[in-house]
Amino acid sequence: MIADIKKATEQKMQKSLDALKVDFSKVRSGRPHTGLLDHITVDYYGTPTPIRQLANVTLADARTIGVIPWDKKAFSAIEKAIRDSDMGLNPMTAGEMVRVPMPPLTEERRKDLTKIVRTEAETARIAMRNIRRDANTQLKELLKDKLIAEDEDRRAQDDIQKLTDRYIAEVDKLLQAKEAELMAV
């Protein structure tokens, strides 16, 4: 019973950490990468469609992402979706490709992105603490129903606290790395 609670707790914390990594990958840093456009959906014949399902996304050069639509009719819709995203990008059609030049980040934009990243990290920390609280509540129920002894409960709570500390430290490490990436000129 205790092992199941610990395992479920660790799985939930890992999912929260993975979600944070995905959120961080959506935040634009100075360097372009193909995953930057993954969260953009295109209104394709009235259906919101992820950009990856409509086009091949590549790095054209060190400062440009290239989007090559499979359906030539999707050019304008893809361009509009990228322009309307909150990333401050200005795509251009160039032959068979939509070129998305990555302008250098201004100091003000870097600070805004840092605030966003810190907020996402804090949300992940709160999620970790809520998962810990839920696990401790389950342990208290087992103790109340006399299915485990007090010392087992205390040991399990200590283990869950160590798990929480480990995952929160991982969140802090990811946050530090992302902040350093954002502030690098």
Curated annotation (Swiss-Prot):
Belongs to the RRF family. Disulfide bonds: none annotated. This is Ribosome-recycling factor. One of its GO terms (molecular function) is ribosomal large subunit binding. PANTHER family: MITOCHONDRIAL RIBOSOME RECYCLING FACTOR PSEUDO 1, RIBOSOME RECYCLING FACTOR. The keyword Cytoplasm applies. GO terms for biological process: cytoplasmic translational termination. Responsible for the release of ribosomes from messenger RNA at the termination of protein biosynthesis. May increase the efficiency of translation by recycling ribosomes from one round of translation to another. It comes from Nitrosomonas eutropha (strain DSM 101675 / C91 / Nm57). InterPro entries: Ribosome_recyc_fac (IPR002661), Ribosome_recyc_fac_dom (IPR023584), RRF_sf (IPR036191). It is found in: Cytoplasm. GO terms for cellular component: cytosol. Keywords: Cytoplasm, Protein biosynthesis. The lineage of its organism: Bacteria, Pseudomonadati, Pseudomonadota, Betaproteobacteria, Nitrosomonadales.
